[in-house]
Structure formats: structure tokens, C-alpha cells
Design a protein with these regions (language model features):
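N-terminal intrinsically disordered, acidic low-complexity segments at the extreme N-terminus
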Residues: 1-13
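Cytosolic juxtamembrane amphipathic/interface segments immediately preceding
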Residues: 12-25
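Hydrophobic membrane-insertion alpha-helices, especially the h-region
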Residues: 27-46
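Ser/Thr/Pro/Gly-rich low-complexity linker/stalk segments immediately outside membranes or between
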Residues: 47-63
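Short, charged, low-hydrophobicity "junction" segments
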Residues: 51-55, 154, 180
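Sequence context surrounding c-type heme c attachment/ligation sites in exported
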Residues: 60-112, 160-250
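Structured, soluble extracytoplasmic/luminal domains of envelope-associated proteins
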Residues: 97-154, 158-159
Length: 250
């Protein structure tokens, strides 16, 4: 109005199209963007779903603190002394408290040198007392009281119901070390899940692991026949049928 009053001619503004309208009118750009968003969404959803049930590094607090470092590391107790079922059965099993008492009838406290900055001698001694309470053991009279309490251990390694895994096949027949799947247990103060235990992880191991035939005439015969078939000097678990669906799923 001021410009008109002074006789000044003002150029009219050219109307511009909003960016979102211009984008909406460009069908090619809309198509490309939609495809990109769909693919990106599928990628992130797939990544999320693939992690469901994967509990790598899971280290729950147990009702009785059990140090694998002290038992398997410092005292060099063989894994299969406590997990004896791993030699002959599908499951490694949680050792019964009677197995613990094989030693702890005599060992009622730890040495002074066992203490660490994180865990005191008193703490470890308290865990042994928890064991005595659970089994109903009177350390003074060196006898059982008959009053026991179940220990509700928190499971760490938990495969889906549709997965079959046989410990004896791996430990006894294949001669696989426990640390291959469970990590350097002898150094763990708190037990955790070392490996992802996914299908891809198992298959990768089967493809890379050579079959041990020493002392196994059955495997030696199969190895002789299959090595000729595949034209290789050494067979992997995969070439021995380790990738067949029915071996792990039923």
C-alpha cells in the first residue's frame, strides 16, 4: 500500500510449489524412495528378528556363586568331573550337589590367597555355607541333617526345542574341547554364554572342522570312501553329513 501511494510499481511474486507437492508429483522419485524405505525396513526388521533368542554374553547371577576360575582354573578340575554326563549323553547336565560335596565335605573354606579385589575370602566362604544349607550338611558334626533345600540355578545355555545337540557326539566321538563352544571357562569368575549358538555358527564350525578318526575304525572306513568321492585328503564334519537338516532338527 505504501508503495502504491508513492507511485512505485511492485513486481508480483511468482507462486512456488511446495517441496512436498513437487516430490509427490514426481512418480519416479516416489517409487525409488518407497523401495528404499521398504528395503531399509526389511533389513532392520530381519536384523532384529535374527537376534531374538541369541543370548551371547548372558551371565546371570546364580543363587550360589560358583567360580569356574577357582575350580577349573586354579585347581585344574576337569570339566567332565562335574559334567560327567557330557561323555555319554545328549545333555552335559547340571552337577548334583552331591558332586560338590565330594570335595566340600573337607573343604569348608577357601585359602587366604583365593580372595580378589572383587571377591573377599568371607564371600567365598559364605557360598560354601550356602552349599551346606542346601544339602543339609552340618560341618561341625560332619553329618547330614536330613533338611535340604533345592537350589534354583538360572539356566544359561538354552537351545530351542526344535534343535537337537548331543554332547557325547561332540565330546567323546569328535573329541571337541569344552572351550570350543563354552570359551575359556577356566578363567571365568562368573559363567556366561560364550558363543551365539546360532545355526550359522554351528554350520560354520562343521564346514571348517576336520573329522578325527584316530581310534575310530567306523569313521576311518567312511573317511576312506568319502575322501575318494570328494577328492580330498581330509573330510570336514559337513562332508560327513554335518549339514543334513535331520541331524539337528526333528
Amino acid at each position: 500500500k505504501v508503495a502504491k501511494a508513492n507511485g512505485i510499481e511492485v513486481a508480483s511474486k511468482t507462486p512456488t510449489t511446495p517441496i512436498w507437492k513437487a516430490f509427490a508429483k514426481n512418480q519416479f522419485l516416489v517409487l525409488v524412495t518407497s523401495i528404499f524405505l521398504l528395503l531399509a525396513s526389511a533389513y532392520f526388521v530381519y536384523g532384529y528378528l535374527m537376534q531374538v533368542g541369541v543370548d551371547q554374553e548372558y551371565a546371570p547371577i546364580q543363587p550360589i556363586h560358583f567360580s569356574h576360575k577357582i575350580h577349573a582354573g586354579d585347581n585344574e578340575i576337569n570339566c567332565k568331573y562335574c559334567h560327567s554326563a557330557a561323555r555319554v549323553s545328549k545333555n552335559a547336565g547340571i552337577p548334583s550337589l552331591n558332586v560338590c560335596m565330594n570335595c566340600h565335605k573337607s573343604v569348608s573354606e577357601v585359602a587366604e590367597t583365593t580372595a580378589t579385589p572383587e571377591y573377599s575370602k568371607e564371600f567365598y566362604d559364605e557360598q560354601i555355607q550356602k552349599l551346606y544349607t542346601a544339602v543339609g550338611w552340618d560341618s561341625e558334626t560332619q553329618s547330614y541333617t536330613g533338611k535340604s533345600q533345592p537350589v534354583k540355578w538360572v539356566r544359561i545355555h538354552n537351545l530351542p526345542d526344535f534343535v537337537y545337540f548331543n554332547h557325547s557326539q561332540h565330546v567323546t566321538v569328535a573329541g571337541i574341547e569344552c572351550q570350543t563352544c563354552h570359551g575359556p571357562v577356566e578363567g571365568y569368575e562368573v559363567q556366561k554364554q560364550f558363543a551365539p549358538l546360532t545355526m550359522g555358527w554351528c554350520i560354520d564350525c562343521h564346514r571348517k572342522t576336520d573329522v578325527k578318526m584316530e581310534g575310530n575304525a567306523y569313521y576311518a572306513k567312511i573317511h576312506e570312501e568319502l575322501s575318494k568321492k570328494y577328492g580330498v585328503d581330509k573330510l570336514t564334519a559337513a562332508q560327513m553329513g554335518g549339514l543334513e537338516c535331520g541331524k539337528c532338527h526333528y
